[in-house]
Amino acid sequence: MHGVIAEEWDREVGEGCGWQRRWEVALSTSFERADSEVVTVAVAPEMVGSTAAIVVLSGCQIITSNCGDSRVVLCRGTETIALTVDQKPDRQDELMRIESEGGRVINWNGARVFGVLAMSRAIGDRYLRPWVIPVPEVTFTTRTDDDECLIIASDGLWDVMSNEEAGQVARRLLIRRRRRALMGEVDDGVSPAQAVADNLTAIAIGRNSCDNISVIVVDLKPKRKSPSNA
């Protein structure tokens, strides 16, 4: 996906529209390309599908693009801010879109498209077209000095942990690891961000999460040199 996005961005640079619009087009086209490539999978291509949450970081912007119920959360100071909105079949606008196409949302262990899929957008899952679509939602957030980290995770984490709890865990562990690193006390080769991701994953497993658990944490604070390296 990274290479596809880079190609689409390079293609959009020469189009002459505003930078936000270029990103929207580049990301949407990238998701469409990824969706098209799913049909090349040898085994049951119509049944293969995935969510996706993409983050592009610049010096002043956080750009997100998501399809499905993987989520991007920003820890900013003491706040925890969801930068994406899960695309669920019972979300009012998604429900209206599905029903306008002749689809149905059935409650079967939660709201599901035709009682099958618990998300309303995805890459793949072509057997549920045109109700489940690979069209991402794109957001733009201006960075601030208070930004601590991003948590990018699949629903295996969010099913058992709220945004606020995940943010609290991340802040607490980041502060502790950074302080220890600054004092030269951490020598396990694990970055503060990786330590947070590992910890969140362990919590989800400990709570018997039943879904895929994929967690990425991005440290948004500039690296500080330890006293020995100053």
Model-derived segments and spans:
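PP2C/PPM-type serine/threonine phosphatase catalytic domain
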Residues: 1-230
